[in-house]
Amino acid sequence: MKGGSLSFLFVLLIATITSVICFSDGMLPNGDFELGPKPSDMKGTQVINKKAIPSWELSGFVEYIKSGQKQGDMLLVVPAGKFAIRLGNEASIKQRLNVTKGMYYSLTFSAARTCAQDERLNISVAPDSGVIPIQTVYSSSGWDLYAWAFQAESNVAEIVIHNPGEEEDPACGPLIDGVAIKALYPPRPTNKNILKNGGFEEGPYVLPNATTGVLVPPFIEDDHSPLPAWMVESLKAIKYVDVEHFSVPQGRRAVELVAGKESAIAQVARTVVGKTYVLSFAVGDANNACQGSMVVEAFAGKDTLKVPYESRGKGGFKRASLRFVAVSTRTRVMFYSTFYSMRSDDFSSLCGPVIDDVKLLSARKP
């Protein structure tokens, strides 16, 4: 009986561990594409068997790319590991994953364009989908990390990454690597902050070896944000940065406004008409060689505040606050950077001021 009990406990322990692994945040099975096709499933760089790459199903013209491979005069570099995949015209990759129905999830993946065309990616988990433009390159390596969110409609999610492009040269398709997932837990307002997720602690998965931050593109038409409670209301992306690779004013995460007035973030808060509120926040730099004069513009309804910040590119921050009287039951809080900035160490990577620790509280009467 004792041996039977031990056997049962062992089986239960294994089942528990398996369950935890199944739903843990991190890289998808073979999300880095390091497990590749057999030589018999290849024709040059093209993968000719739709199930040749473990854990993935392919459709259309998909290439298996080795780091250092040449495309004309261009050397193709992989951000991590040795391999990535390239999606030709109308090509796609997909993977089915066990999830929890009703939960919110964020996908993170690396992408790089290989030609001058206006390349885009269509990311979908039915019924949600979104088109992500990758024409703008934010880092000097050519690779950027992107995030996209969805809500699980069932216990199985079919994740599809599709290239909707129609380039004349199929070799002009985008490169994909490092596909990861993270469960999102929508935050709630508290008696210490009317805004939700004001410290940006809840957000997309950041790959441990990623030193560029994660781009959250504009999702005006999408139902879910990978940065819960916040909307990217601009033409360009904002960047989600972590304390492991950047200077962060508070906690472990923050947001970098990397594209001037084209990079804005907003949240709508419930307010009482005629009541006075104080919007407070931190402005700084990410310790990423982003130097020079910066200005963050903060908006609360019809009121605005410009906060200058002189950056040496070595980290640091200052605090600011905006006092206003609510004129509506719903007040839009928004931030953007007045100027465009480039990193001084490579002059090709977009950067900008960091905002963090955003709080909205009702003010006491004097």
UniProtKB/Swiss-Prot annotation:
Glycans are attached at residues 98, 122, 209. The keyword Cytoplasm does not apply. Keywords: Cell wall, Developmental protein, Glycoprotein, Secreted, Signal. It is found in: Secreted, Cell wall. Gene3D superfamilies: Galactose-binding domain-like (2.60.120.260). One of its GO terms (cellular component) is extracellular region. InterPro entries: DGR2-like_dom (IPR006946), Galactose-bd-like_sf (IPR008979), Pectin_Meth_Modulator (IPR052437). SUPFAM superfamilies: Galactose-binding domain-like. The keyword Transcription regulation does not apply. One of its GO terms (biological process) is positive regulation of seed germination. Residues 1-22 form the signal peptide. Together with BIIDXI, acts as a positive regulator of PME3 activity during several developmental processes, including seed germination and endosperm (testa) rupture at the micropyle, probably by modulating the pectin status in cell walls. Interacts with PME3. This is BIIDXI-like protein At5g11420. The lineage of its organism: Eukaryota, Viridiplantae, Streptophyta, Embryophyta, Tracheophyta.
